[in-house]
């Protein structure tokens, strides 16, 4: 396409079209009266949908004109041409797509953040008098897609709506394809952005009084009408404030769900949540036209019912995608996803992004997992049955919206047939999640029987092709089919009969769409054609004829087939409407199937990866024996991952892992031990499947688990992996999963915070250090003593003394004021001094083995603080030139000889705070009198 400069030079007209006297690139610039009738109608429709790309049906193509033609040609890499639109206007830009390729091109446009208005022909062009009647039959936006080919099977496609009022906000979101519909309200403005980041909506509605109320902001586009608290990476549609009126929104919800009050769905006292939900419903009415969107009854949720994971934590823990390249492979979801249904895949993603806070609910999931782990043959049989169930949620959604085809309904019928088999399979189970499958709604059994008795086993893809309905379903349909068979039989016998009558052995009866049925005779025999033959076409080697009786039979076949297709479609519509009436019931069953699928998959992972069932409780303790990173261990050869234990936040010391056993030992005792290359690193899952939690045996006496661990060690030794490992184990446990450890006892966390790595934020002009400080400030302002905080390299993006000072004060604040369970990885070895000041701080290190000419990373976490980072060795391993490595060693020797960084602490008053500690020796606040903190 042409560069932007070319567009500007020609008033928006690409250079190639400017050469062809195209004067108007925007339909707003033309006088409608000067256009041809069809183009006048196009402009009228475009004015009604200025925010959307208008696809206008003309024959076998969907055409676009003016600015939309330029946009579509550019985005889809199509040929941009022009069309004559009248003497005054002349030619205008045009691009088109074949009608049969509509879905394929719409997918590309929707993925780029465009809305599309489909203006289709609503009458037969052959019967039209004058201009063919056209109407907008559908508006496709990123958040309202229901077509199967435009959706990812294993993730939701959410449409969201946000209403702000002061510091409070309301949020509603729905998946049009599955019918899910939720709303909430909160008073923390920072949380609205975090909730949108969790949902990753394809489109978000926002009320504004902006002049262009129908503007759609594509991802990254700026607008003065969009508040700072809303993330810019999403697609936003600006709507009128009136669309979110509380009175109208409330009335719309009551009418849609046939309610007398909103009290029963929990949002009667949440006006902003009601406004957001009502505004979302109005948008669906505007975009879906006559297509009904069967949403489930609105459900109200509360953010405080779930473990809070902010965007930074989801990114750093790589829950659904990797932080490096944003891919699925290598994420926690990838490592745990053994689901066999699309519904289960979507449910697992939701579970991982919304871990539970209720111990009882977590234990319900664990109980189900335990049954599935203990009985491998039962789990295998269950998964085999689940594999045969199609995507009930989206099939019900398409049926309810009137877009399901014959294959969709057959898939539903086949799925319903598996439900009684599933019910019999889980008849004796006790766990609540599997008990949900024991009851098969009789309405669905009856519906499945109806669908199977009416529809053929393999219906065609398109409803207009016929052959949908079985014989014997409708007497009129059977009669019409018999008539067609009779007439087609007559035509089939015509060829041998005419050969006998005419004596022309090469005579044939053929058919094409242009002429219908005809009789073909070679030109050399054309003089033998009977007088009742009517010549229709002359070709190089043959003459084509018709007869009155042949045309009569042909007309009867065509007319009867039209009647058959019409009647079949009517019967199919009745079946589809019947399915739509049961959409809510189908979705209830789908939710039970999805949950069972998730838990069966988690059980499979637990078996093959050697996971244990964590002992969950409402306390602050985090005790993990032989913990492992769930993703990294799957990426390494079996047994190569070195497990490590963790103890945080408890009142007693338990554990049979390295940390628990090592209390009271010298930190350097094991540093020269041989590295563990994987032998016996974790239980063999084939011989030791996880069952009930392994009791953690008491270790040597220790006053408490620390609230904060200062973790030091070499570069590339595995500190960041260890931090993520602890966070992922806690998250998995609160999802209800078993965890990669030999034993674990875990208290509920209200939030998990991570600050692991940082990069410049060029979009907002923030440096690496400023990004780091913003994330750290967020943690300090929101963490509680029930939070888990994982910090890596705080203060590294600025001068050494500044960074050390900040790291010290942050660690001190977390341990003494907040008392959050914290692991603080750092290369500031001076922070080891904190363990001698605050008695809820402990030092641990990732050990190495020193060899004469190299170091070996052992990846083992042991008590005690490291005094070296071995950064030069890490540089050598990374491939820095030998001369650079040698020079670095020389410089380091000189620095160590002439400089000493020491923290001068002097005795002071007892520090007042919540942490348990010895008397604190504090730095004198008066700079003139304080000791040298960083003396040289």
Placement of each model-derived feature along the sequence:
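Charged catalytic and DNA/RNA-contacting regions of genome-maintenance
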Residues: 2-6, 11-371, 387, 391-400, ...
């Amino acid at each position: 396409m042409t560069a932007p400069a070319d567009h500007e030079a020609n008033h928006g007209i690409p250079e190639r079209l400017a050469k062809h006297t195209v004067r108007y690139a925007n339909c707003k610039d033309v006088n409608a009266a000067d256009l041809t009738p069809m183009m006048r109608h196009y402009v009228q429709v475009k004015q009604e949908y200025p925010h959307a790309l208008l696809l206008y049906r003309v024959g076998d193509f969907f055409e676009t004109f003016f600015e939309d033609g330029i946009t579509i040609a550019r985005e889809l890499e199509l040929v941009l041409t022009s069309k004559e639109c009248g003497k005054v206007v002349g030619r205008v830009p045009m691009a088109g797509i074949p009608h049969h390729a509509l879905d394929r091109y719409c997918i590309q446009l929707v993925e780029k953040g465009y809305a599309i208005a489909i203006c289709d022909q609503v009458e037969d062009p052959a019967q039209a008098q004058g201009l063919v009647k056209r109407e907008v039959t559908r508006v496709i936006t990123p958040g309202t897609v229901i077509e199967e080919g435009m959706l990812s099977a294993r993730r939701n496609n959410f449409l969201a709506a946000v209403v702000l009022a002061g510091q409070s906000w309301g949020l509603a979101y729905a998946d049009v394809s599955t019918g899910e519909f939720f709303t909430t309200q909160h008073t923390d403005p920072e949380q609205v952005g975090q909730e949108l980041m969790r949902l990753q909506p394809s489109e978000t509605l926002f009320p504004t009084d902006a002049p262009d109320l129908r503007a759609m902001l594509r991802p990254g586009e700026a607008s003065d009408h969009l508040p700072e608290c809303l993330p810019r990476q999403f697609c936003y549609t600006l709507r009128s404030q009136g669309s979110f009126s509380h009175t109208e929104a409330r009335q719309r919800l009551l009418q849609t769900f046939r309610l007398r009050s909103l009290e029963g769905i929990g949002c009667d006292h949440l006006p902003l949540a009601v406004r957001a939900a009502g505004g979302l419903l109005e948008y669906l009415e505007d975009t879906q036209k006559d297509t009904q969107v069967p949403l489930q009854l609105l459900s109200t949720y509360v953010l405080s019912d779930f473990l809070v994971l902010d965007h930074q934590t989801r990114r750093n823990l790589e829950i659904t995608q990797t932080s490096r390249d944003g891919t699925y492979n290598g994420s926690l979801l990838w490592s745990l996803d053994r689901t066999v249904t699309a519904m289960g895949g979507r449910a697992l993603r939701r579970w991982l992004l919304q871990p539970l806070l209720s111990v009882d609910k977590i234990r319900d999931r664990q109980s189900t997992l335990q049954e599935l782990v203990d009985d491998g043959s039962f789990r295998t049989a269950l998964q085999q049955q689940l594999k045969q169930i199609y995507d009930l949620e989206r099939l019900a959604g398409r049926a309810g919206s009137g877009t399901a085809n014959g294959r969709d309904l057959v898939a539903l019928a086949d799925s319903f047939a598996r439900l009684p088999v599933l019910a019999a399979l889980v008849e004796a189970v006790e766990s609540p999640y599997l008990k949900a499958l024991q009851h098969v709604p009789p309405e669905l059994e009856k519906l499945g029987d109806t669908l199977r008795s009416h529809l053929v086993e393999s219906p065609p893809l398109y409803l207009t092709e016929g052959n949908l309905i079985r014989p014997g379903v409708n007497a009129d349909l059977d009669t019409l089919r018999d008539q067609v068979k009779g007439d087609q039989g007559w035509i089939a016998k015509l060829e041998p009969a005419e050969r006998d009558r005419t004596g022309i052995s090469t005579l044939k009866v053929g058919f094409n769409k242009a002429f219908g049925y005809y009789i073909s005779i070679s030109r050399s025999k054309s003089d033998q054609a009977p007088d009742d033959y009517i010549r229709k076409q002359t070709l190089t080697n043959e003459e084509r004829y018709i007869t009155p009786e042949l045309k009569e039979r042909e007309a009867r076949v065509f007319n009867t087939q039209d009647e058959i297709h019409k009647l079949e479609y009517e019967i199919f519509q009745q079946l589809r409407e019947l399915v739509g009436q049961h959409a809510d019931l189908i979705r209830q069953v789908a939710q039970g199937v999805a949950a069972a699928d998730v838990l069966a998959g988690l059980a499979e992972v637990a078996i093959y990866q050697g996971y244990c069932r964590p002992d969950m409780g409402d306390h602050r303790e985090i005790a993990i024996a032989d913990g492992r990173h769930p993703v990294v261990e799957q990426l390494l050869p079996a047994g190569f991952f070195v497990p490590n234990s963790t103890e945080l936040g408890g009142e007693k010391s338990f554990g049979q892992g390295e940390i628990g056993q090592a209390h009271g030992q010298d930190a350097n005792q094991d540093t020269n031990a041989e590295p563990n290359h994987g032998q016996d690193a974790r239980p063999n899952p084939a011989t030791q499947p996880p069952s009930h939690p392994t009791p953690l045996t008491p270790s040597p006496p220790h006053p408490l688990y620390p609230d904060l661990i200062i973790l030091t060690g070499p570069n590339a030794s595995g500190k960041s992996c260890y931090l993520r490992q602890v966070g992922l184990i806690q998250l998995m446990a609160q999802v209800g999963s078993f965890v990669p450890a030999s034993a674990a006892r875990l208290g509920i966390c209200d939030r998990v915070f991570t600050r692991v790595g940082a990069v410049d934020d060029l979009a907002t002009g923030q440096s690496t250090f400023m990004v780091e400080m913003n994330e750290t400030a967020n943690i300090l302002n929101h963490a509680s003593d029930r939070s888990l905080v994982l910090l890596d390299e705080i203060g590294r993006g600025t001068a050494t003394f500044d960074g050390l000072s900040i790291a010290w004060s942050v660690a001190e604040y977390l341990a003494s004021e907040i008392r959050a369970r914290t692991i603080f990885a750092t290369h500031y070895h001076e922070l080891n001094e904190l363990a001698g000041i605050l008695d809820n701080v402990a030092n641990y290190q990732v050990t190495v083995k020193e060899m004469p000419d190299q170091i070996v990373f052992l990846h083992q976490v042991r008590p005690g603080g490291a005094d070296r980072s071995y950064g030069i060795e890490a540089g050598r391993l990374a491939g820095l030139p030998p001369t650079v490595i040698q020079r670095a060693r020389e410089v380091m020797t000189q620095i160590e000889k002439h400089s000493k960084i020491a923290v001068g602490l002097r005795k002071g008053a007892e520090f007042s705070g919540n942490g348990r500690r010895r008397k604190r020796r504090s730095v004198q606040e008066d700079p003139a009198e304080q000791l040298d903190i960083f003396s040289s």
